[in-house]
């Protein structure tokens, strides 16, 4: 079993726990939801990583806020949509590892993180 994503967040983000938040909104989540989730992330409690799952994913402002949280506070917030979950299930059906989807998402975020 590939643990690359989980090993990465454990070792590089120094976290033991991942906060999962589910938003059943018909619209994309906004920066408001990112800022709210960010408040749950606390280094001393060993939780610096969150995954927000929502029906339609995140809007551009939410993604910008998630990048800002990572850049300024070292808090990782990934946003998944229903379609992302379907893709992860399809990966599992094909014998692939769904965690690779999360690894690719993390790599993309880190490679495009501005100063």
Describe every region a protein language model picked out.
Residues 1-115:
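Mixed-charge (Asp/Glu-Lys/Arg
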């Amino acid at each position: 079993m590939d643990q690359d994503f989980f090993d990465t967040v454990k070792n590089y983000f120094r976290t033991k726990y991942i906060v999962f938040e589910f938003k059943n909104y018909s619209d994309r989540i906004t920066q408001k939801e990112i800022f709210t989730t960010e408040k749950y992330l606390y280094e001393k409690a060993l939780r610096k990583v969150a995954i927000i799952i929502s029906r339609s994913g995140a809007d551009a402002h939410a993604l910008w806020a998630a990048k800002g949280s990572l850049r300024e506070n070292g808090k990782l917030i990934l946003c998944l949509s229903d379609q992302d979950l379907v893709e992860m299930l399809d990966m599992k059906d094909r014998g692939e590892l769904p965690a690779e989807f999360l690894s690719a998402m993390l790599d993309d975020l880190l490679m495009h993180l501005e100063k």
